[in-house]
């Protein structure tokens, strides 16, 4: 018992002495900074978009942590999408009106651990507020491309459901800022749109890749007769 009391007394004296010791920043100079939070990870980075005229403004989409915004070129970030589906597949910014941001929910990395989304969302105030603007049954969105001459015209690539056939796969277009959508390229229920690019000199020229795939609990089938590359020279009217 005496030894126990002596140990406690020595510990208290040591703590008191440590509390009075002055610690300078050089004491910890050799320790490298490391991430200690938040506890809930954001997951994979699935999309990054920046504002051309204001390079310090960035939006980052994640597989499980929503959308984050930086106004310091990536030194600091704040979450701006906490009330909405946290799985994000694509982001696009209207460079003529950079406060207008489009987000497609549901990441397109077709792993067996992905989460689904709930369609397209849009903000007109730099991420402060969001409205859902359609494609609710898409589940996974891989790309958003905006017409640089008309911010109301957008193309959205939808791979579609991971585990089953779906008629909601394909390439969609809106000409009214997301109020209405038209499916402009569709192969079959097994094949979705994986990617789309636009000729920066002529926004009517598009290339779209269609991808046939299917995930099962223990396997993944990638490719098939539905997979192909398509080109349009009239804004998606013909392919």
Model-derived features: positions:
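Beta-propeller blade termini and top-face loops
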Residues: 20-239
């Amino acid at each position: 018992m005496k030894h126990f009391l002596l140990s406690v007394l020595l510990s208290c004296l040591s703590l008191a002495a440590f509390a009075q010791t002055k610690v300078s920043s050089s004491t910890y100079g050799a320790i490298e900074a490391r991430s200690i939070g938040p506890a809930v990870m954001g997951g994979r980075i699935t999309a990054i978009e920046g504002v051309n005229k204001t390079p310090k403004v960035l939006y980052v989409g994640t597989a499980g942590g929503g959308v984050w915004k930086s106004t310091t070129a990536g030194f600091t970030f704040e979450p701006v999408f906490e009330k909405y589906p946290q799985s994000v597949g694509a982001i696009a910014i209207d460079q003529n009106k950079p406060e207008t941001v489009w987000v497609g929910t549901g990441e397109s990395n077709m792993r067996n651990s992905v989460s689904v989304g709930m369609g397209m969302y849009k903000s007109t105030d730099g991420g402060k507020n969001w409205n859902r603007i359609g494609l609710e049954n898409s589940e996974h969105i891989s790309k958003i491309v905006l017409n640089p001459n008309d911010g109301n015209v957008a193309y959205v690539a939808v791979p579609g459901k991971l585990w089953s056939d779906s008629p909601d796969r394909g390439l969609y277009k809106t000409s009214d800022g997301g109020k209405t959508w038209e499916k402009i390229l569709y192969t079959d229920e097994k094949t979705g749109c994986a990617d789309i690019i636009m000729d920066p000199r002529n926004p009517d020229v598009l290339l779209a890749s269609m991808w046939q795939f299917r995930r099962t609990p223990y396997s993944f089938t990638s490719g098939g007769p539905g997979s192909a590359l398509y080109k349009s020279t009239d804004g998606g009217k013909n392919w």
